[in-house]
Amino acid sequence: MKQLKPNSKYLLYGQALSFMGDYCVLPALLILSTYYHDYWVTSGVIVVRSIPMVFQPFLGVLVDRLDRIKIMLWTDIIRGIIFLGLTFLPKGEYPLIFLALLFITYGSGVFFNPARLAVMSSLESDIKSINTLFAKATTISIIVGAAAGGLFLLGGSVELAVAFNGVTYLVSAFFISRIKLQFVPIQSENIKEAFQSFKEGLKEIKTNSFVLNAMFTMITMALLWGVVYSYFPIVSRFLGDGEIGNFILTFCIGFGGFIGAALVSKWGFNNNRGLTYFTVLSIVSLALFLFTPIFAVSVIAAILFFIAMEYGEVLAKVKVQENAANQIQGRIFSVAEASIGLCISIGSMFINILSAPVIMGLIVVIVCGLFLHTKLVNKSFLERDNKTEQKGVF
């Protein structure tokens, strides 16, 4: 950390605080949505948070032509002001205004990530260090953010958690304003070429069974994420007045993810043991989460669920990186990013149109389908490796 240059430190400080605010405000927004007494509003919170991801793959075209520091700066300022403004909106009133303001904040936020990644690539010798530290800071920020939100709620106001998020964005903007990088515009592909790249990514997914399996894994997990997010307010009711439970469950995201990341090397890649652990954990943890009336059991189920999701995410990314040409990977991940945002939104709406047993049955069918497809792909992977080794011997 001490070896980092000032620009790298400012970026890391700002993002750690901003990410902390994100996971402090997520449960707070879910709590505020329950005051409307309509689960479509709860689903709406998740949809407006996720659906802008569909457009993110095409934003690199704009980011490459504009000053990335200014994009990050103004995005954080806009988000900070709107979140502070949300605290003045009466609870349970004006649902369309509530969702519209959230859509503006998360919609503007999709410009931020491409700009941040581009800035990180300009940090020269600090690139590896900043990426490693950012990954660690992400997990810690989720845990600390959820804990901070819980403390605000115990202090008597869920709006404080929303205000805290607004403040973290403004503090992040302050650090970003101190980053000194010379802006060099890049003449990147136009919109038509961006769509062509997207189509090439789709073509690779269709023709490469390993990449198709990675995509299947990512969209399955996105559906599961949407379902679990939408059930946070319901499950939280089994603890007191139900509000503090949302923050505890958000804490489980970071804690489960931390454990899941540590288990990746032990469970292994492209083998049936890890696949079995992932499948069993996903189904059992989700069933417990949806049906148990005991909050402590729900917490354990949530941790197990997020362990499985972290493992699956790493597995899917590695499968793309190992089995697709380097020049096509960005296009594949662009398709994945858009699909994930769409599937989280779809999963979050199941609660409004399907009963819990039907949702669970649908998830079991999808996850079992993924299990069978992955098993076939793993077999192909082993056969390919064996052929490569035999050629090496001769």
From Swiss-Prot:
Compartments, record wording: Cell membrane
Q: Name one GO cellular component term.
A: plasma membrane
Keyword Protein biosynthesis in annotation: no
Per its UniProt record, what SUPFAM superfamilies does this chain match? Answer: MFS general substrate transporter (SSF103473)
Where is it chiefly localized? membrane
Entry's transmembrane regions: 11-31, 43-63, 69-89, 92-112, 142-162, 166-186, 215-235, 244-264, 288-308, 332-352, 353-373
> What is this entry's stated membrane topology?
Multi-pass membrane protein
Recorded hits in Pfam families, A to Z, give: MFS_1
Q: Which keywords describe this protein according to UniProt? A: Cell membrane, Membrane, Transmembrane, Transmembrane helix, Transport
Q: Name one GO molecular function term.
A: transmembrane transporter activity
Describe the task this protein carries out: Part of the bacilysin biosynthesis operon. May be involved in self-resistance to bacilysin by permitting efflux of this antibiotic.
Q: What else is known?
A: The compound ppGpp is essential for the transcription of the bacABCDE operon and GTP regulates the transcription of both this operon and ywfH via the CodY-mediated regulation system.
Q: Which family does it belong to?
A: Belongs to the major facilitator superfamily. Drug:H(+) antiporter-3 (DHA3) (TC 2.A.1.21) family.
This chain belongs to the protein called Putative bacilysin exporter BacE
Q: Which organism is it from?
A: Bacillus subtilis (strain 168)
Taxonomic lineage: Bacteria, Bacillati, Bacillota, Bacilli, Bacillales
The gene is bacE
